[in-house]
Amino acid sequence: MNEQLVNRTMAFAGILQAIAQVQHLARHGELDNAELAASLNTILVTNPDNTADVYQDKIVLQKGYKLILNQLGDSSQKDVEITRYLVGVLALERKLVRSNSGLGMLAERINQVNRQLHHFAITDEQVIANLASIYSDIISNLGPKIQISGNPVCLQRPIVQQKIRALLLAAMRSAVLWRQLGGKRRHLVFARKAIVDTAKKSLTL
């Protein structure tokens, strides 16, 4: 397989995985801690030797690959909500990479979280609150806010709101990586078959 396409597809799976977790949280108010940790940990890997270093939990990433098959493949069951969130994340990512001050602040704040992890787990409420505030302070104001749909009772809970923002930050991290690896929106239209084929092969590795 083309190594660049494999890496790019891995990063794209990371975006969809985090977005799907946002959707699940918004609807149900809960998310498996291991799955949450797997996505949040990607935020902290800022200087990886290779793409695989960003995604340590390969089992969780399988869900992202399956979402690629569903969203870009021939399935008639495409999730329009996932697509809407994806469009929002990619739009904010473009704004972020054009903002030198935003990128600088983001790196500084992520370093603070890394220091916080000397004392707390990444799924600790204090760490999640910190990650959520990074999204609110730096990302959210760059462009139109992503409107999250779900169960109003769940969405009113502060911890659910914070986890959703933290996961949107994780989706942004994968979006930045995807773009760094040469990912472009037009690939999602004109190179869909290659992306889907790569996702299928990655599922069997």
Swiss-Prot record:
Major localization listed first in the record, in broad terms: cytoplasm
Alphabetic keyword roster: Cell inner membrane, Cell membrane, Cytoplasm, Membrane
Membrane protein topology class: Peripheral membrane protein
Family: Belongs to the HflD family.
Gene Ontology cellular component annotations, sorted alphabetically: cytoplasm; plasma membrane
Superkingdom of the source species: Bacteria
InterPro entries registered for this protein in UniProt: HflD, HflD-like_sf
Organism in which the protein naturally occurs: Shewanella baltica (strain OS185)
Pfam families assigned: DUF489
Gene (name only): hflD
Protein name: High frequency lysogenization protein HflD homolog
Subcellular location(s) of the protein: Cytoplasm; Cell inner membrane
Keyword Cell inner membrane: yes
